Each structure stands twice: as structure tokens, then as C-alpha cells.
Amino acid sequence: YDTEENQWGGTVTGGLKISMFDVTNVSKPKEAFTEIIGKAGTYSEVLYNHKALMFSLSKGIMAFPLNRTTDDYKSDFSGAYIYNVSNDSIDIRNMITHRESDKTYGDEIIRIIYIGDYLYTFSENKMQVHSIDTNNKVSELIIK
């Protein structure tokens, strides 16, 4: 969320920030909620591709793919963050991953959609189906 210049002249971000704004007064929006996810190197496809964000106010959910890093630039989570969303709050609901080991190529979640009461997550290697109501994995299809 905060960006610094590194010693070589490039930039490094300090985590991923999500915010909710109170726009009751459109000319003076107020940050009502904020969360910083991960450390420098944390990445989400949604930073560069708006289609990677799944949002449904009627379902009360928001989801996006995420590769989270720690202080030493090591990845400690690769998958999707799922949030409960209402008019006045955002709360983490579930974290879904396709990874079965630390270094599995092609298991990074790149898209999330919902159909009915099910959430579908897609990576190059898998498609998983999760119940929105229970957060449980219902099905998995290996694409390899």
C-alpha cells in the first residue's frame, strides 16, 4: 500500500491495502475501514486487472486472488481472500488455496466467480467449488 523507492531506483510496495469509504458527503469521503495485507512483495492480480475482483453486494461477498509475503519477502499464502461485505463493514470470511506444497507452479488462483450459492476458484491446474454458506470445499477438478 505504501510505496518506497529501492536502492536501484525501482519501487517496492509495503503490502496490499483495502479500504471502505463513507461517501455520505461525496466531496469529503472518509475512510471507514482499512486493512493492510502482507508485507513488501504482496501481490494481487486485481492491482492490474479489474476482472480479478469478484464483488456481489447482494451476496455480501468480495473476493480476490492474493500472493501474500512476510517481512523477508517469502510467500506465506497463495490463494484467494474472501470477505463478508455490508454497507458498514468488511470482515474476512475465508481464505482458499489451491496449493498443496510450498512450490507448486500453476496453483496460483487467478479468478473467482460465483454461481448460485457456490464460489468457483480457478488456477492453471485446478478449479475448486466452495459453498458460500458453509465455506466448505464441495468439489475439485484437476486440469493438469
Where are these regions (language model features)?
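Feature marking well-ordered beta-strand scaffolds used for ligand recognition
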Residues: 1-144
